[in-house]
């Protein structure tokens, strides 16, 4: 499983380079290990890969509308790059993959001023 990435806008806006590296280099390392060990791997992606959708509701094959140089691009594009690497490792190396796009999570250790939609509503 690969769930590593800052998800709070407050956090990832402070460390954009590290956030993007998790989505690219971290994923590359994870997939390389899965290939070497013939392991299955699942990544937790995000609804942010859709960006600001121009289509409602979005279908599974919707490509998204992400601003590649916007404030949140380090997170959005990192997740998009991660999904691309997953697909490419599957196609090129037959690594067994699963991609899940998780929307609006909340948990007991989430900071109340996290900056995500659920904590903002609460």
Predicted segment positions?
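Substrate-binding strand-loop-helix patch
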Residues: 22, 108-119
């Amino acid at each position: 499983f690969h769930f590593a990435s800052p998800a709070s806008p407050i956090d990832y806006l402070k460390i954009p380079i590290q956030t993007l590296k998790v989505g690219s280099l971290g994923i590359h390392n994870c997939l390389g290990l899965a290939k070497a060990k013939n392991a299955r791997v699942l990544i937790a992606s995000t609804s942010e890969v859709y960006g600001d959708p121009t289509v409602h509701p979005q279908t599974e094959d919707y490509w998204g509308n992400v601003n590649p140089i916007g404030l949140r691009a380090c997170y959005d594009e990192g997740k998009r790059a991660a999904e691309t690497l997953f697909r490419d490792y599957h196609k090129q190396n037959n690594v067994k993959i699963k991609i899940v796009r998780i929307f609006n999570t909340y948990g007991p250790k989430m900071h109340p001023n996290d900056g995500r939609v659920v904590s903002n509503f609460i």
